[in-house]
């Protein structure tokens, strides 16, 4: 396939990617009680890189403590323990020749106030989306 560029190297800003295959972010709601991602989630992301993906997006990572969480099980990267959990994953993804990309996430109006640490929803609009 002479016109197929899927498996050819690609430059993305300063990064040279081995191909154009990326693993889309998946919000799996699989973190522990303290919002540290479980080991099986981290292993899953590393395996995607080891199996040939050039870009591996994390699942949705909550942006702050009080307002971004919208439902149970969301990972964060705010405390040192959370940062330390993500650090080896990024290193292993890079060691496999892939680029680790974090999906920064804020739930906004779609959040559940009962699971948000602040007990409220913060969003740019007061209009609730249709359910």
Feature locations, PLM:
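Non-globular sequence segments
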Residues: 91-94, 99, 105-131
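N-terminal capping/small domains of soluble enzymes
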Residues: 1-107
């Amino acid at each position: 396939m002479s016109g197929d560029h899927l498996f050819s190297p690609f430059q993305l800003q300063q990064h040279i990617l081995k191909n154009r295959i990326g693993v889309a972010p998946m919000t799996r709601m699989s973190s522990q009680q303290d919002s540290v991602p479980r080991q099986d989630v981290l292993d899953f992301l590393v395996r995607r890189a080891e199996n040939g993906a050039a870009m591996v997006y994390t699942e949705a990572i909550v942006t702050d403590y009080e307002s971004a969480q919208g439902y149970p099980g969301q990972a964060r990267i705010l405390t040192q323990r959370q940062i330390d959990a993500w650090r080896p994953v990024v290193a292993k993804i890079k060691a496999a020749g892939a680029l680790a990309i974090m999906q920064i996430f804020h739930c906004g109006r779609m959040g559940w106030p009962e699971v948000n640490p602040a007990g409220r929803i913060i969003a740019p609009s007061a209009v609730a989306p249709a359910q």
